[in-house]
Amino acid sequence: MKIFLGILIPFAGTTFGAACVFFMKKSLGRSVQRSLAGFAAGVMVAASIWSLLIPAIEQSKNMGAFSFFPAFVGFWIGVLFLLLLDHLIPHLHVGSNQAEGPKSKLNRTTMMVLAVTLHNIPEGMAVGVMYAGFLAGNVQITAASALALSLGIAIQNFPEGAIISMPLRAEGESKKRAFLGGVLSGVVEPIGAVLTMIAAQFIIPVLPYLLSFAAGARLYVVVEELIPEMSQGEHSNIGTVFFAVGFSLMMVLDVALG
């Protein structure tokens, strides 16, 4: 039951964030969007380092001087995997008027939801890998560290849920449809977590590769989506400040609970 709840925690963060559409004005201000994107980016970077890359390297210490190898390979596979999905799936980032991926007749709303859904895949995989490692009895991964990652992703997903539902509302969608769009973008997380856990049961020896794969995919999202989003418009430091807030919060959470 604890593992089931741990898998659902990130999805709950997205759902609560999407619910902001019922309580806030029709659109988010530029400074608020920058702050939310910066905060989410900071959480993702810290979680990728402390919860994924460092455990991946520690689990490969028996390789001696080459203990970096699984983390290096998994990281690059994660980056290339997201790069491939970016080219295969039509999507539109929030705040952008130019669609990415193959040409499509999908409307703006659908492509905006697809963009967030696409980049939520690594979140579910990260949680699934952590709980798979815990179930396998991996000494570097405890129930507390897996929970810390779930909580961190949920904290990050709250602003991301608002970032998708509020623009959908601004696009002319009803509050209910905007909320559902935000919720649907996060459904892939528990699904991805469960599928990753099932797969990991059969390939535990490559757990370090899976951990670093999730890290590479997450950092791809930060650089490709969140950093540009927090830097849009006139120069401002608010995105950078909230990046630092998110990073330090996730660092404390991971170390304190891990």
Residue ranges, per PLM feature:
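Intrinsically disordered, metal-sensing/regulatory segments
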Residues: M1-G258
